[in-house]
Amino acid sequence: MRLPIILDTDPGIDDAAAIAAALFAPELDLQLMTTVAGNVSVEKTTRNALQLLHFWNADVPLAQGASMPLVRPLRDAASVHGESGMEGYDFVEHQRQPLAKPAFQAIRDALMHAAEPITLVAIGPLTNIALLLTQYPECVFNIRRLVIMGGSAGRGNFTPNAEFNIAIDPEAAAKVFHSGLEIVMCGLDVTNRALLAADYLATLPTLNQTGKMLHALFSHYRSGSMSSGLRMHDLCAIAWLARPELFTLQPCFVAVETQGTWTAGTTVVDIEGRLGQPANAQVALDIDVEGFQRWAAEVIALAP
């Protein structure tokens, strides 16, 4: 039986690969997509998400979400993904529009009308998820688990200690980690190792239309290089859902720093239990890199 999921995303070049996997992995049933400001503005992430859904002719509703973090100004990652968020490929024009409701409302409605609890997958800043929990706290009973691409038990990639998705909206992340939800955290400890290798990247243009599109986007992606391999951060969250055996998880207490002058957005991951707090997340600390690469190639080959 396919696992029903809702994907909250901020496309983003590596988001495109994650969305492909969410659509075409046979284990998953993507029921709703929502967008959030992160890699670029929410207007751009929404446009990019709609372009991808049209590219794949996917019958998945999409709702536009938060345009700003809860309390902070938005800082984006256009330097990594390009000004539009998905530079490098000319998508055809389309008439698709987002739902006439905000993301947190769309998620709430999907959860409350579902026949079974749904897994949320958040591969951008956690603003929409925090808004959902604030406005509709009763929804926690309809959420099977939350799988996050974000955080780090070690170094950051946006500041010395903070990973981008958490650093953009630390207050939202803090609320989410203290929500009582069952959380799986796929952070930089595994995503920095989740490379698509250069020899595989070179085969993409001859694979299928999805391969051609991803190759064009990847050529403009600044998280690695086409010659040394590209980090597929967001794809890890989908990989865990489809192939959890590829990851080594450890239950940990995770706190999010919101006050530090230099450390805001840091995920304090208490691997050794020194803080004496109960675990609130399953944290991915290791990944079978070759297994991940095989799975990624398999799922991209399933796309048109």
From Swiss-Prot:
The keyword Hydrolase applies. GO terms for cellular component: cytosol. The keyword Hydrolase applies. It holds the Pfam family IU_nuc_hydro. Keywords: Glycosidase, Hydrolase. It comes from Klebsiella pneumoniae subsp. pneumoniae (strain ATCC 700721 / MGH 78578). Belongs to the IUNH family. RihC subfamily. This is Non-specific ribonucleoside hydrolase RihC. GO terms for biological process: purine nucleobase metabolic process; purine nucleoside catabolic process; pyrimidine nucleobase metabolic process. Hydrolyzes both purine and pyrimidine ribonucleosides with a broad-substrate specificity. The active site is at 233. One of its GO terms (molecular function) is purine nucleosidase activity. It comes from the Bacteria. It is an enzyme of class 3 (hydrolase). InterPro entries: Inosine/uridine_hydrolase_dom, IUNH, Nucleosid_hydro_RihC_nonspecif, Ribo_hydro-like. Its EC number is 3.2.-.-.
